[in-house]
Regions:
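Switch/communication elements of ASCE P-loop NTPase nucleotide-binding domains
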Residues: 1-53, 277, 281-408
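Phosphate-coordinating catalytic segments in nucleotide- and nucleic-acid-processing enzymes
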Residues: 47-309, 377, 382-408
Length: 408
């Protein structure tokens, strides 16, 4: 079981400097642009730096404009995870770009042999010739562009090189493609200009398959953290396997009926939702026709009921979006339950007033309140810091001081 005890972030995105201790349930609030989402992303990357690829076009913005580098340190009960980010200098950027093009050349040299009668060349000669022609097209302007869109990630004492060189690579390969195919067509005796054109287009298309990539090797992956962006949960959940989906669907149906999330619900799956009218007659509604609030809570439950999240860390981005207050309340109870019973650690951002205040209602059981008094933190993000409140402090601020815990 993995549990975070503290998070320290320096120079990552909008966060200049932040150090917070964490509990089992962590509610992250604050105004826009104070770093709420950045905090969740920092935690995710500290466990799974390979996710840096997901930032693709925005790699250059991951390091705060006022910093030369970013550092994320996450303390857990079993050790420390550290991720450092820095921009490469011109020399390193050039080396990274050349290596990336070399890797690309190695991957397409067989395609060249398939398109042309080039048995007069050995595979090594062919690969070397193609590599030389592509690399000859690299200019200082290309390297400067690559430098702006690349990062060096230092993770657990090892360096990993990540670059988005899409525009520069396309220009280099486009300029080299015609030269390559004409040369080999000439030397192999091919006169088919259509093949030449198709090959050039195919060469560019093949390169587009992996526009943002790690050079040499990727950092190790981790399954300890799940990031759930609830803005996307109105989309139908992706199915995994028949057996796993059947169990998960049954669990969701049981939860919906037991907690009376939807009136008159009788059965649920991702294709149809069955209801029973007052007359006793049953009817079905296609899942796609259900409202966004219903789809959002289904999407969250689908993720939270996954066996892989049990006992691990779940990062929730704005639960409550699209949801009716009744859905929000039941979701909150469910989050408390999985944190309390399964040992799941929750870090969630929110602007939702109902979601926050429902943590302090009289509807909670005594056991739930005792749990929250020991394992709840409200992290109120500010421009360059965070105010962390315990359960009792947050409740006093809400009920006695009448403060807005959203930090607005």
């Amino acid at each position: 079981m993995t549990r975070i005890t503290s998070v320290k972030v320096e120079g990552f995105k909008g966060i200049e400097s932040l150090h917070v201790n964490t509990t089992r349930v962590n509610l992250v609030t604050g105004r826009n642009n104070t770093g709420k989402t950045s905090l969740l992303e920092a935690v995710l990357l500290a466990f799974d730096p390979a996710k840096l690829k997901d930032f693709s076009e925005n790699l250059s913005t991951l390091i705060n404009a006022k910093h030369d580098e970013a550092c994320i340190t996450v303390e857990t009960e079993t050790g420390t995870r550290t991720l450092g980010l820095e921009k490469p200098d011109h020399t390193v950027a050039r080396q990274m770009f050349i290596e990336s093009l070399s890797e690309f050349t190695d991957s397409v040299s067989d395609r060249i042999r398939d398109n042309f009668d080039s048995e007069m060349f050995t595979p090594d000669e062919l690969r070397s010739e193609v590599k030389e022609r592509i690399i000859d097209q690299v200019t200082e302007a290309h390297v400067s562009e690559v430098q702006k869109n690349s990062l060096i990630a230092h993770f657990q004492g090892k360096a990993y090189f990540l670059l988005n060189s899409d525009n520069a690579s396309r220009e280099v390969i486009k300029d080299a493609a015609d030269d390559i195919v004409q040369q080999f067509a000439k030397e192999s005796g091919s006169k088919n200009s259509v093949d030449t054109e198709r090959f050039g287009i195919g060469l560019l298309g093949f390169h587009m398959l992996d526009r943002t990539r790690f050079v040499r090797e990727s950092p190790p992956r981790s399954e300890s953290v799940s990031f759930i962006d609830t803005h996307d949960l109105t989309i139908r959940p992706e199915k995994e396997s028949d057996e796993a989906d059947a169990v998960k669907t049954d669990d969701i149906e049981e939860f919906l009926i037991k907690n009376e999330i939807v009136d008159d619900l009788r059965s649920f799956n991702l294709d149809n939702v069955v209801f029973e009218a007052d007359s006793g007659k049953k009817y079905s509604v296609p899942y796609e026709f259900m409202g966004d609030g219903f789809k959002a809570i289904i999407g969250i439950l689908w993720e939270l009921l996954d066996d892989e999240t049990t006992g691990e860390i779940v990062l929730l981005e704005e639960p409550g979006v699209h949801m009716h207050p009744g859905y929000v309340r039941e979701l909150l109870y469910f989050i408390i339950r999985i944190a309390r019973e399964n040992g799941t650690q929750i870090l969630t951002t929110t602007h939702n007033h109902d979601f926050i205040t429902d943590f302090f209602t009289e509807n909670l059981t005594e056991g739930e309140r005792v749990f929250l008094s020991e394992e709840f933190s409200l992290i109120q993000m500010q421009q360059n810091a965070a105010d962390v409140m315990t359960y009792e402090e947050a409740e006093e601020s809400l009920k006695e001081l009448h403060l807005d815990l959203r930090g607005l």
